[in-house]
Amino acid sequence: MLTLQEVVETIKMVQEENLDIRTITMGISLRDCADPNPRAARQKIYDKITRLAGNLVKTGEEIEREYGLPIVNKRISVTPIAIVAESCNTGNFADFARTLDEAAAAVGVNFIGGFSALVHKGFTAADHRLIDSIPEALATTERVCSSVNVATTKAGINMDAVYRMGHIIKKTAELTADRDSIGCAKLVVFANVPEDNPFMAGAFHGVGEPECVINVGVSGPGVVKNAVRTAKGADFGVLAETVKKTAFKITRMGELVGRTAARKLGVPFGIVDISLAPTPAVGDSVAEILECMGLERCGTHGTTAALALLNDAVKKGGAMASSYVGGLSGAFIPVSEDAGMIRAAEAGSLTLDKLEALTCVCSVGLDMIAVPGDTPPETIAAIIADEAAIGIINKKTTAVRLIPAAGKKAGDYVEFGGLLGRAPVMPVKPFSAGEFVRRGGRIPAPINSLTN
């Protein structure tokens, strides 16, 4: 039975500590939309998305009113378009992205993910066509997000794909240069990508998923920060327990909202992603949680240990609260979307190298990082390769969302607004890795991939 104290505590979390449900994401299988005629395939895609997701936004708003919990985003993920459009007789898949954009606008969601390809072991003809279409697709749409998986622990790293994505990211930045290269903010390169991730820009509906499903992403850095503040001076055991109990409460809310949405929409409930997702709002920062633990500034020595403790405690609390935890489920550290991260980068405490180290113990890693516009594609590819290596060796998801900001240099800023925020342009190493990334082929899977 709920106590009055628990009710008051929940109200405080929402009103004073920025607790919200970050996203309700409907995953939709588009495999039955395949058709050799590209126009027919696009029509099937539009019709299916608008039919299944037509009430998604309305349902989310009903749940907000019913429970008094803000649901910030209602989103859609679909089967990777490289799979759906494989049989189509067309050389350019950008029209499929525009169809997704139209469908997303029709149902009122702010993002739709799934303009994606899975190429960790090699390319199909459709994969080539989709990847070549990414810059145009992201430059001519507002709501479409794209992702490419280039590595897995079982397959190793497809360095041909890594090298190619360096050029694709660069071209995407150039085509959206008039908007601070925002196209790159909607493009993620993954290793060990999850198939049930509700968060953008990396969401897609995996081939092992059901016909339609509801996945939920929670938030709550502000709630965790205030809990950590109450444990000032306590030892690490007490600190971890404090975070764990708070994560339990946050995840319970996510599960309640997810199951309610699934029931109202008549589709299965999938997972709760328990990632701590920051926003640019004051007090809604993962970096500030780490600083409340005793760091003068996020990025200083000790940051990796603090983030490891935070991430582990969140997972333990979340796993106790729900039997269906999935997606990325860790702490996000997107520089442009976290006010504390931005301050740390401005102060010189948080560097690209430190963010790479933090990848080892958090959810994604190099996320929403602006780099100089003249950064060579080979350097971008090398950064992707470093992140992918961390992922495959440690059997975890890693990802890169870099913005080579056209016309900008280190110390300048890019401004995206909204949840994407603003970011200082961070310097990269001036030395070339071109000869290395141009070798091609696959970096073999690590020995710890042999688990049978």
From Swiss-Prot:
Assembly and binders: Homodimer.
Family as reported in the entry's similarity comment: Belongs to the UPF0210 family.
Protein name: UPF0210 protein PTH_0987
Organism, scientific name: Pelotomaculum thermopropionicum (strain DSM 13744 / JCM 10971 / SI)
Organism placement in taxonomy: Bacteria, Bacillati, Bacillota, Clostridia, Eubacteriales
